[in-house]
Every structure is written in structure tokens, then in C-alpha cells.
């Protein structure tokens, strides 16, 4: 993966890789920068040593209104620095990106599996990977299998 970062001129301060659901052939790759993350997927069967990355901003500035929020401090520690923040209607959503995206190999804009509502904590009754298999259907499974094959 480091060779791919170098070849594709992807800057990073840290990175991690983890397998996607149900297999060990397609890997979720995240390269952190000071302002966000380059995210991509790499199959062991890819013919080219290339990863199609997309960039997601961390959006730290959105946290200013809730910096003293006790849950936020716990989430920052828990995420080990791998998070994004986004505004959804009237609330801020904290995404721990280490757990991946719901069918991210099919849709680069897919939601993250672990997310937490910062301004509506009562909606966080069950937050651990609440969306791991959300949005899965036969098409998502077909795309996963094709992507594993290196297509």
C-alpha cells in the first residue's frame, strides 16, 4: 500500500487497511492527512497496482459548538483520530471511519457504519456498527464479488 501511495502521490500522516465484510480479498484502505482522508479499496486480485481514492474532509471546524460535549471527548479518544464530522439537517454526525462504509466499494459517498448524533444523543441507543449491512441487496453483493475479482 505504501508503494501505491508513493506512485499515486497520495500524501499521508498515517494509514490503515482492513478487510471488507465477509472476505479477506477486498481491503478498505484509509490514508490520513491533516485535513481528511483518502479512502479506497484494493483487491488481492487487482491486475494494476493502483487504488482509486476519493477524499473526505474531516470537518473539524464543525465541532466548535460542541467542543465541551462529554460524549465528543470520548468519541475523539475512541476513534483514535480517524473520524469525520458532517452536518445532517439540524444535527452534527460524528463518523468513526475505522469501521468502513456501508457498501463503500459500490458507492464512494455511502454512509459510515459507526456514526453518532452529537446534538441528539437520545437517538444513539445502539450505535455500534448499526449500519454494517444497511443498503445491502443482490446488486451490492454482485458489485462486491466483481470488485473482489479485481474488476
Annotate each language-model stretch with its function.
Residues 13-14, 21-151:
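Extracytosolic and intramembrane catalytic regions of membrane-associated proteins
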Amino acid at each position: 500500500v505504501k508503494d501505491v501511495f508513493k506512485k499515486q502521490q497520495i500524501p499521508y500522516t498515517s494509514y490503515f487497511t482492513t478487510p471488507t465484510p465477509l472476505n479477506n480479498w477486498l481491503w478498505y484502505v484509509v490514508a490520513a492527512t491533516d485535513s481528511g482522508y483518502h479512502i479506497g479499496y484494493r483487491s488481492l486480485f487487482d491486475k494494476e497496482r493502483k487504488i482509486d481514492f476519493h477524499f473526505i474532509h474531516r470537518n473539524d471546524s464543525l465541532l466548535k459548538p460542541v467542543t465541551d460535549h462529554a460524549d465528543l471527548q470520548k468519541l475523539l479518544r475512541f476513534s483514535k483520530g480517524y473520524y469525520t464530522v458532517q452536518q445532517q439537517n439540524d444535527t452534527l454526525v460524528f463518523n468513526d471511519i475505522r469501521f468502513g462504509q456501508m457498501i463503500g466499494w459500490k458507492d464512494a459517498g455511502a454512509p459510515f457504519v459507526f456514526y453518532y448524533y452529537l446534538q441528539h444523543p437520545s437517538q444513539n441507543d445502539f450505535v455500534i456498527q448499526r449500519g454494517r449491512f444497511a443498503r445491502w441487496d443482490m446488486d451490492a453483493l454482485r458489485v462486491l464479488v466483481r470488485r473482489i475479482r479485481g474488476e
